[in-house]
């Protein structure tokens, strides 16, 4: 969890056509137990890579009608991961890419890249059934109010080693232990301020009567560290337009198929090919 930081605000007054920028930092924690038996130097390299993937900064451009959320650009040594399979994205499952929300039509457009191909995920914003708790706290110069929602999430697993042997089709193990997805209950906590009259927030969070300044969602925490109103350079908020348009469910199916394809390729390299004398590891 973050150490508490002071929020700094630049205020130029509100009007119906006000706009602003909110700066957020996000941190996700993952279980590192799978690295216990790994050589120390290799574990150190992986942890460094994971740190870059799990700790990110974002900017939310907003006005009363729409918002645009994207990761803050950071130059990395070596040019980053480049195009291809982003295994960290499949491991942590973040809402990557850029995200535009039209708060009037209730439509979002999420621009994502997968294996070098650009997709525009366009779908309706699902209303969130927030529960107001009545709790308040001070965040910067603003009174923030607490809202929560409880949901069931499916456990995600990612293995870098050998997979557990699959039960044979029709065997007693398969019949008595069907491979059903494991789920657990997660509470999401949002702190929002009605003093900033924007029904939006970081990533897909929103639907509250004010800008969301802080989110605690299972293993991910998002904290707003700065808000600037009516910046000198006027903000142009537009939905991304280049890419293949798909629905959320269509994109999830594409990503799932690609993940399975990469997993099969990885297993094939580990086990080698029967008709090839050279074993690829």
Put a short name on every predicted segment.
Residues 1-2:
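Short, small-residue-biased leader/transition segments that mark boundaries at the very start
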Residues 17-281:
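Extended soluble regions of mature proteins
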């Amino acid at each position: 969890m973050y150490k508490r930081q002071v929020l700094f605000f630049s205020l130029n007054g509100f009007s119906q056509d006000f706009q602003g920028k909110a700066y957020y930092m996000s941190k996700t924690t993952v279980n590192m137990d799978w690295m216990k038996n790994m050589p120390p130097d290799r574990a150190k390299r992986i942890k460094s890579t994971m740190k870059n993937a799990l700790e990110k900064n974002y900017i939310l451009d907003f006005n009363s009608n729409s918002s645009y959320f994207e990761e803050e650009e950071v130059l990395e040594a070596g040019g980053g991961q480049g195009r291809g399979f982003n295994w960290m994205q499949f491991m942590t499952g973040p809402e990557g890419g850029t995200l535009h929300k039209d708060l009037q039509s209730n439509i979002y457009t999420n621009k994502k890249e997968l294996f070098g191909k650009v997709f525009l995920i366009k779908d309706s914003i699902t209303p969130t059934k927030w529960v107001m708790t009545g709790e308040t706290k001070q965040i910067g110069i603003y009174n923030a109010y607490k809202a929560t929602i409880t949901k069931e999430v499916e456990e995600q697993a990612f293995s870098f080693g050998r997979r557990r042997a699959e039960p044979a089709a029709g065997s007693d193990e398969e019949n008595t232990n069907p491979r059903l997805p494991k789920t657990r209950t997660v509470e999401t906590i949002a702190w929002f301020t009605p003093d900033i009259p924007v029904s939006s927030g970081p990533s897909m969070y929103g639907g509250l009567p004010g800008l969301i300044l802080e989110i605690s969602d299972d293993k991910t925490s998002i904290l707003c560290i700065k808000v600037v109103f009516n910046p000198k350079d006027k903000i142009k908020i537009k939905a991304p337009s280049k890419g293949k348009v798909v629905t959320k469910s269509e994109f999830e199916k594409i990503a799932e198929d690609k993940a399975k394809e990469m997993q099969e390729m990885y297993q094939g390299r580990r086990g080698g090919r029967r008709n090839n004398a050279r074993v690829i590891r």
